[in-house]
């Protein structure tokens, strides 16, 4: 299995630099209601196949869930469907909340 992980520091750097990217939050709505990264595109995991045509292919697509397990599967699915810039956010929203936005 190939590693398509991006650390939370890498995502924070993309955001700070203003680099084009999309954060794809694949958690369920009740999970997103607890904590979310600003400007995330929220599409539950089970709905991803129906939204492939609307997702950005030309810049990094960083997929996240709670800890990075579901998003790892989705990042691999996206890569297998032509999204060469799909990445799994290592540690998920949990790592983001602990290391980048602890408030």
Question: Which residues does each PLM region occupy?
Answer:
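Rhodanese-like catalytic fold shared by cysteine-dependent sulfurtransferases
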Residues: 1-22, 28-60, 69-103
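Short, surface-exposed ligand- or partner-binding patches at beta-edge/loop junctions that are enriched
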Residues: 64
């Amino acid at each position: 299995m190939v590693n398509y992980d991006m650390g939370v520091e890498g995502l924070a750097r993309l955001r700070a630099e203003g680099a084009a990217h999309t954060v794809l939050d694949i958690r369920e709505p009740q999970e997103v209601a607890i904590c979310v990264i600003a400007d995330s595109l929220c599409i539950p995991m089970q709905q991803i196949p129906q939204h492939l045509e609307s997702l950005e292919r030309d810049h990094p697509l960083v997929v996240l869930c709670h800890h990075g397990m579901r998003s790892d599967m989705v990042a691999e699915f996206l890569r297998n469907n032509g999204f060469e810039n799909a990445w799994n956010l290592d540690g998920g929203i949990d790592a983001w909340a602990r290391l980048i936005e602890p408030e």
